[in-house]
Amino acid sequence: EFYGGGMSGLSLADRATIANMAPEYGATMGFFPVDHVTLEYLKLTGRSDEIVGMVEAYLRANNMFVDYNEPQQEKVYSSYLNLDLADVEPCLSGPKRPHDRVPLKEMKSDWHALLDNKVGFKGFAVPKEVQDKVAKFSFHGQPAELKHGSVVIAAITSCTNTSNPSVMLGAALVAKKASELGLHVKPWVKTSLAPGSGVVTKYLLKSGLQKYLNQQGFNIVGYGCTTCIGNSGDLDESVASAISENDIVAAAVLSGNRNFEGRVHALTRANYLASPPLVVAYALAGTVDIDFEKDPIGVGKDGKDVYFRDIWPSTEEIAEVVQSSVLPDMFKSTYEAITKGNTMWNELSVPTTKLYQWDPKSTYIHEPPYFKGMTMDPPGPHGVKDAYCLLNFGDSITTDHISPAGSIHKDSPAARYLMERGVDRRDFNSYGSRRGNDEIMARGTFANIRLVNKLLNGEVGPKTVHVPSGEKLSVFDAAMKYKSAGQSTIILAGAEYGSGSSRDWAAKGPMLLGVKAVIAKSFERIHRSNLVGMGIVPLCFKAGEDADTLGLTGQERYTIDLPENISEIRPGQDVTVQTDTGKSFTCIVRFDTEVELAYFNHGGILQYVIRQLTQR
């Protein structure tokens, strides 16, 4: 919950952006209490005085309205975190995680450190002798070049930033100033603009600024999840070849929420989150290897250097265009017909049967196997005996590593499944769009192209070693080989396993692959709960221990000594894990509540709920 004197100066659009980032700062939700700013937004979006008055009266009557003109009752929280808004400065996040914040003024020095650092969340290990490499190529007959840090994707995208008038119109003002000075984005930078709603399009047009965004290549591509989730589409073949053949660490700059490895695009190893105005600025610069305070962005039509300060709009300029361009009637006209649908929606054939009719030919919706063979009696706790290690991970394996939501790689098991059913590559769509098909999502589990699995001894990609045979296989194929032989599997991991988006498929997928337990140094809170919900046992190494300190390679077989009776299992109890090499160690079983034990006893939360419903 956010509180304090700075609240009154924070717009509702800014609050929405911060609240939407809750998973990134480890919260289930971010709550801003209703105050006068909320009421002003209701008026701005076309709500009647009667509705606004009722909202205020109701919340005041329930002591849920914050009035900064009245004496504030001191609130008591379990813990406190103070932020002085005067300390806030322009920044980006990247290149591989949203919580790796980089102040704008430090971007160039940070980039050079990244090239030097060993491979990791803040390193690419590019040898000194090739850090200045220039990859020259022909872009549709035009001479072009890429270097480490060259921006090849610049996208104004996300579900909240793109509904924030100040940053959207701010980006348009940057484009306007750049166009007037004679600056233009290089044609090989893939630019796009996905407004947060139809209202955004209306006020960009009303302001007269959309034409400047168009001039810089930021044309409106549609509404919905685009580059942020990996739906940027292919890069031009010449650009893709230049990156691949010269091993260029190319960059994407986007106004999205998340930049986990492999999410934005397979060919952009460096992915930075930035505000929409900064996205335009970096697109114009064409590189993240730049100090905006000292280095020119480009050369204007008068032959003089143009700097960041020359194209950056003032707060007053932005406020003026917001005031004149964002009007209540825009919200009314856009949303008054929202429940009427459009012609295509209204012409859809809708079955009238009480039960859903599964289409066996559909590659989007498939009947999941969760309830097949289910009986009314709970199966009880499942033990883990002589399980093989499917994957051996280090720290910070995110839900994007576990269950990517972006594009389906042409050589992946999911692609193979689709092609076998006559789906053309251009129609693969994304994992996110096909989350209603368990066959595809199971094949997409651990399909992240940046996956680092210690069983592969340094090789990066969505593969593993099938321990009994020594074969190197896709994770899905190896998992199916274990399942067909009746062999259970476990996963070894480091700290922060399951961080990132709270994605249910990151727990469903491993369950479908036959994973029975995950042994990690620590878990992201929501993901640990999701694992329990799918019947997977989360175990934590004891403090100071992990797979490496215990000498575990992942080549062993693991037996987890769980009691067979659920009444003998307690939240947080110690359990012994034994290996076939003679090693044994103690872990903490991370069932944290009694209800989680009930889920485990039933085989998962889905089975638990079904049994509860049928008993009513």
UniProtKB/Swiss-Prot annotation:
Q: What's the Enzyme Commission number for this chain?
A: 4.2.1.3
Task: Tell me the keywords, alphabetical order.
Answer: 4Fe-4S, Cytoplasm, Glyoxylate bypass, Iron, Iron-sulfur, Lyase, Metal-binding
Any binding details for the cofactor?
A: Binds 1 [4Fe-4S] cluster per subunit.
Q: Where is the protein found, in the record's own terms?
A: Cytoplasm
Keyword 4Fe-4S found = yes
Q: Which residues bind substrate?
A: 258, 263, 421, 502-503
Q: Which GO terms describe its molecular function?
A: 4 iron, 4 sulfur cluster binding; aconitate hydratase activity; iron-responsive element binding; metal ion binding
GO terms, biological process: citrate metabolic process; glyoxylate cycle; tricarboxylic acid cycle
What is a single cellular component term in the Gene Ontology annotation?
mitochondrion
Concerning SUPFAM superfamilies, the annotation shows: Aconitase iron-sulfur domain (SSF53732), LeuD/IlvD-like (SSF52016)
Q: Explain the purpose of this protein.
A: Catalyzes the isomerization of citrate to isocitrate via cis-aconitate.
Query: Know the name of this protein?
Result: Aconitate hydratase, cytoplasmic
Q: What is the source species?
A: Solanum tuberosum (Potato)
Biological classification of the source: Eukaryota, Viridiplantae, Streptophyta, Embryophyta, Tracheophyta
